[in-house]
Amino acid sequence: MPTSIQFQRSSTAAEAANATVRNYPHHHQKQVQKVSLTRGMADVPEHVELSHTHVVGPSQCFSVVVQDVEAPVSTVWSILSRFEHPQAYKHFVKSCHVVIGDGREVGSVREVRVVSGLPAAFSLERLEIMDDDRHVISFSVVGGDHRLMNYKSVTTVHESEEDSDGKKRTRVVESYVVDVPAGNDKEETCSFADTIVRCNLQSLAKLAENTSKFS
């Protein structure tokens, strides 16, 4: 079964990273800082650590969620890299249309409409990174009707250790930085964003594992 690890409330795989982040004054910082959100995690390739290094402003919060998937990297990436079709695994997405570009080239922009019940209607999201070789994808929110202003997400996919029966496992790491809305604090903002990210990655894991079984 897929398991997720929420950064602020981590278990075994992220304990070292959690300790590292506690040393950052990210709840009270007064200036811009650079934060590596995977530092201290075991078996993290260098390019993954670099990808999850963010510049964080004094009115922003940040977090990272880790998801292990019992499926090959290629299967996970084939789903995750479809910038034009996030609703394949993001159940909070009602529809998505690419309004600029082809959905593959950096600079492409998609309009994402979300299901009712969320404090948002739609968002405009720009593709910042699409690296098929290193399996890195990143997008930033550049407009829309929502409360997550200046949201930037980076997601990486890399091969993890094999499990007891020799099957390949994949580790998905998603980190983000976002402005804290007026009237909210950093803990509230990260808690909300973490919940969405965690649900998305759990759904991604289930889809990839089911796809892998029949491939």
From Swiss-Prot:
CDD domains: PYR_PYL_RCAR_like. Abscisate binds at residues 90, 120-125, 147-153, 174. Its main location: cytoplasm. The keyword Disulfide bond applies. Signal peptide: none annotated. InterPro entries: Plant_def-hormone_signal (IPR050279), Polyketide_cyclase/dehydratase (IPR019587), START-like_dom_sf (IPR023393). Keywords: Abscisic acid signaling pathway, Cell membrane, Cytoplasm, Disulfide bond, Membrane, Nucleus, Protein phosphatase inhibitor, Receptor. It is found in: Cytoplasm; Nucleus; Cell membrane. One of its GO terms (cellular component) is plasma membrane. The keyword Nucleus applies. The record marks 119 as: Involved in interactions with PP2Cs. GO terms for molecular function: abscisic acid binding; protein homodimerization activity; protein phosphatase inhibitor activity; signaling receptor activity. Disulfide bonds join 61-190. One of its GO terms (biological process) is abscisic acid-activated signaling pathway. Pfam families: Polyketide_cyc2. It comes from the Eukaryota. Residues 54-209 are annotated as: START-like. A motif (Latch loop) lies at residues 146-148. Upon interaction with ABA, the 'latch' and 'gate' loops change in conformation leading to a tight dimerization and the creation a surface that enables the receptor to dock into and inhibit the PP2C active site. Monomer. Homodimer. Binds ABA on one subunit only. Interacts with HAB1, ABI1 and ABI2, and possibly with other PP2Cs. Binds to CARs protein in an ABA-independent manner, both at the plasma membrane and in the nucleus. Interacts directly with CAR1 and CAR4. Interacts with MYC2 in the nucleus. Interaction with MYC2 is increased in the presence of abscisic acid. Receptor for abscisic acid (ABA) required for ABA-mediated responses such as stomatal closure and germination inhibition. Inhibits the activity of group-A protein phosphatases type 2C (PP2Cs) in an ABA-independent manner but more efficiently when activated by ABA. Can be activated by both (-)-ABA and (+)-ABA. May link ABA and jasmonate signaling pathways by modifying MYC2 transcriptional activity, and regulation of JAZ6 and JAZ8 gene expression by MYC2. Belongs to the PYR/PYL/RCAR abscisic acid intracellular receptor family. This is Abscisic acid receptor PYL6. It comes from Arabidopsis thaliana. The lineage of its organism: Eukaryota, Viridiplantae, Streptophyta, Embryophyta, Tracheophyta.
